[in-house]
Structures are given as structure tokens and as C-alpha cells.
Amino acid sequence: MDNNSQNIDKLKQEFIANASHELKTPVTSIQLAVETAITALENSELEDTRKFLNQILIDSQRMTLLLSDLLDLSQLEVNDPIKELVNLKNIVEAEIRFLPEENKNRVNFESVDIDFLIDPDDFSMIVRNLLRNACNYSEKNKKIDVNLFFDNSDVVLTILDRGRGISKADQERIFERFYRVDKGRSRALGGTGIGLSIVKHAVERNNGNIQVKSNLGEGSEFIVKFFNT
């Protein structure tokens, strides 16, 4: 087996381990929280019950994000894109509305109405993962700028965060499946290391490309371009 194959196998093993851990941890936490909440209800400890129910909600959200990544990846690998003429501005606005309230208020979105031939599920997937990435890797009080515009007949989507930035070495690998820039932080956020590879796959199969511009300490800008050919 060559080095490249060994590296891929190692990354796959890491992903399986990470995914298993991320699924097992919230399930265990949910079970414990439910048991404790039941006991607290029996003892009329309402404040404790509120805290445990909140933990159930958080862990359920983590599981949902992980399963969403796995389902997105499966969809991209199994199904061919089904392109439709859709309004891209409406799709971006919908994905912003789906964000948690504290993140929704951080996003500045500017766009004209753009009708474009693309797989709408793929485009939603792209926007959703890039928004999640920007929210996760920037401070909670920092704004995120999202722009959607025409470049002649092509379409460009940019998402700019003001986070910690990405090193030049990591920029060369961030779109690789299973690769994580900061494994410790990704685990704390419930990440699996496949979000940006999902984005790249979805972009390229819709006749587009993606690049990142970033300096450490200065945030990151992801630039997606779809070609009208």
C-alpha cells in the first residue's frame, strides 16, 4: 500500500473514531440528563430540571449536525445533481433564518435577486456548511459578511468571518475529507472534519470552484464561483 493510500485509510479511521465518539457522547449525556430530570421532577427541583432539559437540547443538536453531515456526504456520493432555475438569494436567506438566534444576528447579507441553474439542495448544503464554519470559528460578538453577486454571467458567493484565521499550510488541506485544522476545537464544537469537503464536492459538481483567503489572526474569506456555461 502506498503512502497516499495509507494516509487516506488513517484519515478514514480517524473519522470513524470521531463520528463514533461524537454520537456516543451525546447519547450517553442525553440518557443521564433524562434520568436526572425525572428524579428532579419527582423531587420538584424545577431549576435542576431546566438545566438538564437544556443539556438534552444541546446534545440533540450536536447529533443532528453530525447526522446531517453524514447524510449530505451520502447524497453527494450516490445521487447526481438535479439542476433547476432557482432564486439563490432566497436560499441564502432561508439558511440564515435557520441559524440559532445568536448567530443569525451576526450575519450581514447583501445580494441582488439572482436566478441561476443549479441543484438547489447542493446550494443549500454549500451555504449551510460555510455559515456553520464561519459561526463556529469566529468569536460570538464578531460579524459575518455574506455577499452574493454576478460576475458577468457567473455567480459569486463570499462568506467572510473575523475569526482566528487559517495558516497557509492548513489552507492547502482544509478541503480534504476528514481533515481538521484544530482537532481539539473541532471536537468541542462537535465537528467531524467533513463539512468543507462536502462544500467542495457540491461546488465542483455544479460547475464551480472554491478558494479561501486567510491570514492568522485576521479571519477567513471563502469565495465560491459558479460558471454559467
Where are the model-predicted features located?
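Conserved micro-motifs of the catalytic ATP-binding
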Residues: 77-82, 115-118
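A conserved beta-strand-to-alpha-helix junction within the catalytic ATP-binding
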Residues: 82-97, 149
